[in-house]
C-alpha cells in the first residue's frame, strides 16, 4: 500500500476538536479507511465514503464433521443456508438493521440448496460456486485436491470482484459450515507456531468428550502438514468456504477494497491470505474478538485491534455486521467533525 498520504490524514484527524487520540481505535479506523481510499489519488481524501457495504457468507460442509465433533450434524449447514435465504437468521437481522447487502455463497455443501428447497435455486441472494459435495475427512486424507484449492481461490476472487464491480467499496465476510472450526484450528496449528491444543476450542458449544476427540482428529490432520506451504496445507485440512474466502481477500487487496473480518474462522482465512500476500493485511479491519481458542493469537499475529468484544461465537458474519456502525462513525467524524481552526477553538 502507498502510505505517502498517511501523515496528511493523521494531521487532519489530530486537528479535529478533541484531544489527541481521544477517539481511540476509531481514529485508527478512520486513518486506515482514508488511506485505502487515497490509493491512486493525487492527495489524501477529504471524505471517507462507505458505499453499498456487502456481507458475503461463504458456506461449505466438512468431512471431518462425520466424526461427531460438532453440536449439530452436517445437514444443518444446508438448513441454515435455507434460513439465510428466507431471512430468518441472526445475520439477516443485523444486516437488515444496518442496511447491509447480503449474499450467501454455496462453496460446497453436501448437496445444492435446491435439493432441500427447490424454489431457492434461483434466489437472488444465492451464489453457487460449488467445489464438491463437502470436503473429505481431513483426519484420514487430504480435505481437497490441489486443483480444488486453485479453483477455490479463483472462485473467491470472482465473487469479490463481481461484488466490488457492482458498486460495493466495503466487503464483509462471514461463514457457515458444520465442522469448520476444526478446519480453521487445523490450518492455524499447521501454519503457526502454536500447538494443536492452543488452536482447538469449543466451537459453538461441544462437550468435553467431543473436545478431546476434536483435538485428536485435528492433530491427525496437522501431522501430514509438516513442511508444506500455505496452499498445500489448505489442500490437506482446509474447507471449501475457507479457501474461497482466502481468494476473496486476495482479490479485495488487488482492487484496493477494505474487508471487515468476522470471527475466528474468517480471521484464519485472513491469516492464510497474508501468508500468500502480506499486503492483504493493509485492507483488513477486524470486527470482534471471539471466544474461540486461537483467535487471540491470530489477532495478535496480524497486529489487529478488534472493535468489539461481546462474547460472540455464532459466526455467520454477525460480529462484522454489528461492527459496521463503528466504521460509519469513524467515517462521519473524519468527514464532518470541525477542526480547531474552523470552530474557532483555541488550544
Swiss-Prot record:
The organism's place on the tree of life at top rank: Bacteria
UniProt xrefs under Pfam families: DBI_PRT
GO biological-process terms attached to the record: cobalamin biosynthetic process
Active site positions: 316 (proton acceptor)
Keywords: Cobalamin biosynthesis, Glycosyltransferase, Transferase
UniProt pathway: Nucleoside biosynthesis; alpha-ribazole biosynthesis; alpha-ribazole from 5,6-dimethylbenzimidazole: step 1/2
InterPro entries in the cross-refs: Nict_dMeBzImd_PRibTrfase (IPR003200), Nict_dMeBzImd_PRibTrfase_bact (IPR017846), Nict_dMeBzImd_PRibTrfase_N (IPR023195), Nict_dMeBzImd_PRibTrfase_sf (IPR036087)
A molecular function (GO) term: nicotinate-nucleotide-dimethylbenzimidazole phosphoribosyltransferase activity
Substrates-to-products reaction catalysed: 5,6-dimethylbenzimidazole + nicotinate beta-D-ribonucleotide = alpha-ribazole 5'-phosphate + nicotinate + H(+)
Documented EC number(s): 2.4.2.21
Family classification: Belongs to the CobT family.
General function of this protein: Catalyzes the synthesis of alpha-ribazole-5'-phosphate from nicotinate mononucleotide (NAMN) and 5,6-dimethylbenzimidazole (DMB).
Protein name (database record): Nicotinate-nucleotide--dimethylbenzimidazole phosphoribosyltransferase
Species per Swiss-Prot/TrEMBL record: Vibrio parahaemolyticus serotype O3:K6 (strain RIMD 2210633)
Amino acid at each position: 500500500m502507498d502510505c505517502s498520504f498517511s501523515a496528511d490524514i493523521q494531521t487532519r484527524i489530530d486537528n479535529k476538536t478533541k484531544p489527541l487520540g481521544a477517539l481511540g481505535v476509531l481514529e485508527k479506523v478512520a486513518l486506515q479507511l482514508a488511506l485505502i481510499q487515497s490509493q491512486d489519488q493525487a492527495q489524501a481524501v477529504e471524505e471517507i465514503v462507505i458505499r453499498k457495504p456487502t456481507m458475503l457468507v461463504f458456506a461449505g460442509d466438512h468431512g471431518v464433521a462425520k466424526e461427531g465433533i460438532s453440536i449439530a450434524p452436517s445437514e444443518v449447514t444446508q438448513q441454515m443456508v435455507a434460513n439465510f435465504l428466507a431471512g430468518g437468521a441472526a445475520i439477516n437481522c443485523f444486516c437488515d438493521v444496518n442496511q447491509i447487502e447480503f449474499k450467501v455463497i454455496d462453496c460446497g455443501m453436501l448437496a445444492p440448496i435446491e435439493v432441500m428447497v427447490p424454489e431457492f435455486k434461483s434466489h437472488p441472494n444465492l451464489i453457487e460456486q460449488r467445489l464438491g459435495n463437502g470436503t473429505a475427512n481431513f483426519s484420514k486424507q487430504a480435505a481437497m485436491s490441489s486443483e480444488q484449492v486453485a479453483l477455490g481461490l479463483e472462485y473467491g476472487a470472482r465473487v469479490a470482484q463481481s461484488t466490488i464491480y457492482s458498486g460495493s467499496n466495503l466487503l464483509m465476510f462471514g461463514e457457515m459450515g458444520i465442522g469448520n472450526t476444526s478446519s480453521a484450528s487445523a490450518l492455524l496449528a499447521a501454519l503457526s507456531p502454536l500447538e494443536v491444543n492452543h488452536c482447538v476450542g469449543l466451537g459453538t458449544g461441544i462437550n468435553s468428550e467431543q473436545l478431546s476427540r476434536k483435538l485428536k482428529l485435528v492433530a491427525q490432520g496437522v501431522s501430514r502438514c509438516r513442511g508444506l506451504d500455505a496452499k498445500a496445507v489448505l489442500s490437506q485440512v482446509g474447507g471449501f468456504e475457507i479457501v474461497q474466502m482466502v481468494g476473496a481477500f486476495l482479490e479485495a487487496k488487488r482492487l484496493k477494497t477494505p474487508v471487515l473480518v468476522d470471527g475466528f474462522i474468517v480471521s484464519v482465512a485472513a491469516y492464510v491470505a497474508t501468508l500468500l500476500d502480506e499486503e492483504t493485511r493493509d485492507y483488513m479491519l477486524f470486527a470482534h474478538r471471539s471466544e474461540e481458542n486461537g483467535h487471540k493469537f491470530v489477532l495478535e499475529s496480524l497486529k489487529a485491534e478488534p472493535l468489539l468484544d461481546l462474547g460472540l461465537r455464532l459466526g455467520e458474519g454477525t460480529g462484522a455486521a454489528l461492527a459496521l456502525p463503528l466504521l460509519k462513525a469513524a467515517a462521519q467524524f473524519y468527514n464532518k467533525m470541525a477542526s480547531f481552526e474552523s470552530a474557532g477553538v483555541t488550544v
